[in-house]
Amino acid sequence: MSHLQPKRDTPETTSDKVELKSLYLETLQLVERLHRRLLDVIKDEFDRAGRTDINAVQALLLFNIGNSVLTAGELRTRGFYLGSNVSYNLKKLVELGFIDHQRSRVDRRAVRVSLTKAGLQVADIVAVLYDRHIGSIDKVGGLDEGEFQKMNKSLQRLDRFWNDSIMYRL
C-alpha cells in the first residue's frame, strides 16, 4: 500500500522546485520589464521627433491596429491592447484624429475602428523603429533568428499555460 502514500519531496526535487520557482519569477519580472521598456523605446522615438501629441501606449495601439478594422473587444482578445481602459484610449485617439470609428451595421453595440491617415503615419513611425531594430539586433543585441524562435516558442507555451489555468482553473 505504499503506492497510496503521498510522495515526499527529496532534497533533489525540493532543490529543483526552488530553481524552477526562481526562474519562473525572473521570467515574470522580465516580461513586465520588457513591456515597460518597449513603451520607453517608443516614447523616446516620438520625443526625438518632437511628437508630443500621442503617448507610447496609443502609438503601439495604432501600430497594432495597422490596416485592420476591429472592435474594441477584438483589440483586447487579440492582445493588441494591454491596458485596462481601451475605451478611454480609443475615445482619445478619435478626438485626436488618429482613429475613425463607426457603429457596426450588424450589432449596433459594437464600434468598429480603423486608422485615419494621421493614425497610419504614427503606425509607420513605430514600424520604421522596429525595422531599425531588426537591422542591428543580431549584431548589437546578440539575438538572431534562432534565439527569437526559441524565445517565441517558450512565450507562446507560457501564454497557453496561463490561458489554460484560467479556462480550466488549474
Question: What is the role of each PLM region?
Answer:
Residues L34, L38-V41, E45, G79, ...:
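Alpha-helical linker/hinge and terminal dimerization helices associated
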